[in-house]
């Protein structure tokens, strides 16, 4: 598994994909951090992280589109199935490599509360909880993109479908509001597909255990389908 992780992680930075993902996310975060937190004086990072969500939904498909689609197109997926390494470990290695690329950005984000602290008192705990929530949301989004990539040979189709799924999930609260407001069974099912809502639960700086469990269950369910 660790050999797969290292190989995949290295491959992302041997071409433009890894650098593009890290740079784009970091640049947009830096822009909103400057506007919201430094210029306008907001002490909370939640608003900055929320502002880059749409860009993140565009960046994730670019990162995940080749995870399995490229193997299926080149027919190298058969080698993975017959390799002495269990398929589950190969899948986990690929996933952790993409998560590590995303974590490069998160590591930089973790420095920003310290920058704000130099200008005055800020809610440090709430800031780091917001970063943790965004990391969990990103981890679930990457799992979705990886799952979709395993369904097709085309990287373009994988990228487009991943964005569509993430965008629909992002808009799920609005969509369920149009369907019904009385909390019927349909809205409850649709709310289970909303990856973004658990992230919003961290807005007040509360470490919501149910949101963490939701992301953990989502990841486990998607990985089980990838290895089956």
Residue ranges and their predicted role:
Residues 1-18:
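Aromatic- and glycine-rich beta-strand/loop motifs that create alpha-glucan
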Residues 67-97:
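Helix-loop-helix units of permease transmembrane domains in multi-pass membrane transporters
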Residues 29-34, 45, 55, 97-158, ...:
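Secretory targeting signals
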Residues 220-227:
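Conserved small/polar residues in nucleotide/adenosyl-binding loops
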Residues 48-70, 105:
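Long, hydrophobic alpha-helical segments
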Residues 32-35, 152-203, 207:
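Transmembrane helix segments
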Residues 19-22, 128-132, 159-160, 212-216:
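Hydrophobic alpha-helical transmembrane segments
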């Amino acid at each position: 598994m660790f050999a797969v992780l290292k190989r995949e992680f290295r491959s992302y930075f041997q071409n433009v994909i890894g650098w593009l993902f890290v740079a784009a996310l970091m640049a947009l975060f830096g822009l909103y951090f400057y506007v919201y937190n430094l210029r306008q004086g907001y002490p909370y990072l939640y608003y900055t992280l929320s502002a880059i969500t749409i860009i993140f939904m565009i960046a994730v498909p670019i990162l995940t589109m080749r995870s399995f689609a490229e193997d299926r197109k080149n027919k190298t997926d058969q080698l993975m199935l017959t390799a002495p390494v269990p398929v589950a470990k190969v899948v986990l290695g690929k996933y952790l490599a993409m998560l590590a690329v995303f974590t490069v950005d998160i590591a930089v984000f973790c420095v920003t509360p310290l920058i704000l602290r130099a200008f005055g008192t800020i809610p440090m705990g709430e800031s780091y909880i917001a970063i943790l929530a965004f990391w969990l949301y990103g981890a679930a989004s990457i799992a979705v993109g990886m799952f979709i990539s395993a369904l097709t040979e085309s990287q373009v189709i994988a990228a487009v479908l991943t964005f569509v799924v993430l965008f629909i999930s992002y808009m799920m609260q609005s969509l369920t509001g149009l369907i019904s407001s009385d909390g019927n069974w349909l809205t409850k099912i649709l709310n289970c597909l909303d990856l973004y809502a658990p992230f919003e639960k961290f807005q007040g700086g509360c470490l919501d255990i149910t949101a963490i469990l939701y992301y953990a269950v989502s990841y486990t369910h998607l990985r089980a389908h990838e290895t089956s």
